[in-house]
Design a protein with these regions (language model features):
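PLP-dependent amino-acid enzyme catalytic core
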Residues: 1-266
Length: 266
């Protein structure tokens, strides 16, 4: 049961909008997804009764449980990023893609690798559930290991492991020296934002007033918000990014007042 909710206001200016999330810049990702045999728009549910009860004009929820049969949006990012890597490979089916995850991102990487006849190796942080590991193992020839490391250490280990073996490291978190692939993943996530905008227009909604996004590691929230901000010319809906109290990294980052990356302990 929720005991309390803390909210902190961040600031957004047009100078903060990255060019790679612009509508035209993300068009190749949408074109790629449309070429996938498994692709179809996921539903945008119209919660009419809830909206009526709460006294608002409309509430709409993007249902990503239908995406590619994987029950999550993550494959949008992994598939696009891996497609760009594979395009440079002489033998795409011989490639190995490595990542660290506690679940859905790993499934996305495994699924995208399988589609190319390639293989994924996934390292999961301590405490990950065996059923989630089994779900990834069930995709192609994926190898999965639940480590004794926390998430950040598992990411570093996966990166070093990929470099040591000549494999491709495909992670949805980046740093100053690792940006291209995380940015490609983030671009992939914008496909669902574009779908939602067009579906809202089908409901007669020119622009939503408010938007709620899950935080996760930040790639989806940042990608979708950045794209939406570009789409509406720097004037996005009032946006709330929600995250658990125990891992409120975005909250602490905004609280710090720093414009750049912020380290959070714990």
């Amino acid at each position: 049961m929720v005991k309390s909710i803390s909210i902190i206001e961040g600031k957004l200016s047009k100078k903060c909008l990255p060019d790679f999330l612009a509508v035209e810049a993300t068009a190749p990702a949408r074109a790629f997804h449309r070429e996938l045999p498994e692709y179809s728009e996921t539903p945008l549910a119209n919660l009419k009764n809830l909206a009526k009860i709460l006294g608002v004009k409309g509430i709409y929820v993007k249902d990503e449980s239908k995406r590619f049969g994987l029950n999550a949006f993550k494959a949008l990012g992994a598939s696009y990023a891996i497609s760009k890597i594979a395009a440079k490979e002489k033998n795409p089916s011989k490639a190995v893609y490595v990542t660290a995850t506690d679940g859905n991102h790993g499934r996305g990487v495994a699924w995208a690798a399988m589609k190319l006849g390639a293989r994924a190796e996934v390292f999961m942080p301590v405490g990950s559930k065996e059923c989630r590991a089994d779900a990834i193992r069930g995709i192609g020839d994926s190898k999965v290991e639940i480590t004794d490391m926390n998430y950040d250490d598992a990411v570093r280990f996966a990166s070093d492991y990929a470099k040591k073996n000549g494999y491709h490291f495909v992670q949805d978190t980046g740093n100053a020296n690792y940006r291209d692939i995380p940015n490609d993943i983030t671009q992939g996530y914008t496909t669902m934002a574009f779908e939602a905008i067009k579906q809202l227009e089908g409901y007669g909604v020119d622009k939503p007033t408010h938007m709620f996004l899950q935080a996760g590691v930040g790639s989806m929230a940042g990608g979708v918000l950045g794209f939406i901000a570009h789409y509406y010319d720097g004037n996005p809906p009032v946006t709330t990014v929600a995250e658990p109290w125990e891992v409120a990294c975005i909250y602490e980052s905004i609280k710090s007042g720093c414009e750049g990356p912020t380290s959070v302990g714990g």
